[in-house]
């Protein structure tokens, strides 16, 4: 879920610049893949599509919904296998930075 956890607890070898939540919501599918690269997992579930991206620090789940003729981000979650708070904007920056360095 959306977390505003203390950014001091987030660490990544490619931390990148945090990406504001407002820009993740409303991002079209083309821009999503330009920013984060190829998803490591996709799933269609009724009216939504899940695209999962991964960095060394987190998984970023973007849920896209059909708007007009295309898909657009409506919900985003950051997940961490370790039990700690995870700020979504920092996770998004990490995933984007890792894509650029690949």
Predicted regions and their residues:
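Residues within mature, well-folded domains
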Residues: 1-102
